[in-house]
Amino acid sequence: NVTADYQSSFGLSAGMDFLFFSSPSQTFLQKDMQSVRQTLNYDSNQRINRWLFYANQLHSLQGGTEINYGVKYTTTHDNSYQFYRDGETGALIPDNSEKLLRKEYTLNMYTGASHSFGKKFSAEVSLAAELYHAEGRHSWMLYPTVNTTYTPADGHTLQMSFTSNRKYPAYWQLQPIIQYVDSYTEAHGNPDLKPSSNYSLDLNYLYKNKYMIGVNYNYTPDYFVQLPYQLPDRLAEMNQFVNYDFQKRWTIQTMASYKVGTWWNGRIFAFGLFSHDKNSHFHDIAFDRHKFSVILNTTNTFILSKKPNIIGTLAGFYQSRAIQGVYNLSPICNISTSLQWTSPDGKTKVILKGNDILNTSNMTTRLAWGQQRNRTEMNWDNRSFTFSFLYKFGGYKEKKRTDVDTKRLGR
């Protein structure tokens, strides 16, 4: 990854970013199914070349108004391949082998402004126009964003936000290839997979920054996720990323902060979530499903001692039954804790952490839709305990680093 940036004294920033990604792998598989044995091996490599160019101009005007506008252009060449060979003869299996060059271009132009109207009201607005072109698919989309904050009186805050954006599939998910997970399960690529758009509206009321109640509506046309399908012509299950017609989410959320003396403080969050998933073209088992779920989350900090400085934390998470397309998801919960000692000069820290200490975050998925039946239980031991010793030398401060965008990389 190579990055070059320019920052001017008059608000102009410009730059470029080049990324080369290569992930070769070799897999051997022996399939024993219905008295038939087949040995396969395949070589694959995900090779990505991505260029990003951008320019942005920011104007700070009198009265606290800021205006910005800019352009961002991304081009990607995907030179990935996968070659299957018979494990005994070494002969190439052309039906399952692919070597493709896939090109993708994205142009994003945007403008935005922010202003504070006195001490009670502030607003931010922006509009992005995005062009996406890949493999014969060509589309323009507009994505507006509005954020407002109103404080009618001390301790009372009203927030409204409308956001919109686009999400792209991982590059490997777009390859027209098949990977064998085991003798029964297969992972199929989907070259027809489309990006999804997301539109979200939030309304929140905060009281003294300690209590909050809010509502959210989230609409995602062309939402994509991996779903299973049991093939009718042979004993196998294919797992493939597919586009829904849409996914909708209505959420009611509350938050409360609490404090017990000077040694315990925490927050608790409660969510009521109504889900609506629809896919009218999912093989021969189209679905239009609804589900109400409850999510609870809490974080707590305990000052166990001031001299010596010892702090403990306890966090908990719970989610009731939920759905994901044709899947039914079991309830899950997670309890994690930590203990931290800090030296009087603040240079030394000793931290002991325990994650999912009751091993209750394993999810069971159940498929019972149409003629499809499947139940998968996760029996992994997710418990982990870590010990950390940290020492800060002199006045060292960690430098800020820009993370490489890897969301679409990997398999």
Which role does the model predict for each range below?
Residues 297-342, 355-358, 366-370:
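C-terminal beta-barrel architecture of Gram-negative outer-membrane proteins
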Residues 166-215, 219-220, 237-251, 259, ...:
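Outer-membrane beta-barrel signature, preferentially recognizing the C-terminal barrel domain
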Residues 1, 15-17, 23-34, 80-90, ...:
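Outer-membrane beta-barrel translocator domains and adjoining extracellular loop/strand segments
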Residues 1-144, 151-155, 211-214, 248-272, ...:
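Face-selective signature of the C-terminal outer-membrane beta-barrel domain
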Residues 6, 16-22, 73-79, 127-135, ...:
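Transmembrane beta-strands of outer-membrane beta-barrel pores
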Residues 47-51, 101-107, 138-142, 195-201, ...:
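Residues that define the transmembrane beta-barrel architecture of outer-membrane proteins
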Residues 245-319:
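Gram-negative outer-membrane beta-barrel transporters
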Residues 343-411:
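C-terminal beta-signal and adjacent terminal beta-strands/loops
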